[in-house]
């Protein structure tokens, strides 16, 4: 018996592959992190089979390389994601995102009275991990929120 293994999303020659994104989160990452703000080709795989997650999303961006800081910000939404840098169709660097200390300009503060919602300032949160949970503290209103509360509003 032979197995024909085919890529479900076309390989890229050079660029970034964000893999192991939880299903239904891929589009949110594209929007929040402004990954579509490029003229380069972007390929998206949604609800792909995954041995580890059951189902996953996948994003491939040609000729763009995410920085370590950008990759780490993805950990807020996709803690198990991997960010692979591709050159000549080969993985030349693999980043495993870790929670950053701060995240700026991506999330929206859930506090409706926070100035970041009405003034022309970039949102800014400090990120804390406590008892296995992630908490985000807004720089402006100084309120602390569980990760899910912030992610729902963003």
Curated annotation (Swiss-Prot):
* Entry GO terms, CC: aspartate carbamoyltransferase complex
Single Gene Ontology MF annotation: metal ion binding
Q: Which InterPro entries match?
A: Asp_carbamoyltransf_reg_N, Asp_carbamoylTrfase_reg, Asp_carbamoyltrfase_reg_C, Asp_carbatrfase_reg_C_sf, Asp_carbatrfase_reg_N_sf
> Which terms are listed as keywords in the entry?
Metal-binding, Pyrimidine biosynthesis, Zinc
Query: Which cofactors, if any, are listed as required?
Result: Zn(2+)
Q: What does this protein do?
A: Involved in allosteric regulation of aspartate carbamoyltransferase.
Into which family does the record put it?
Belongs to the PyrI family.
Q: How does it assemble?
A: Contains catalytic and regulatory chains.
This one is known as Aspartate carbamoyltransferase regulatory chain
Q: What species is this protein from? A: Pectobacterium atrosepticum (strain SCRI 1043 / ATCC BAA-672)
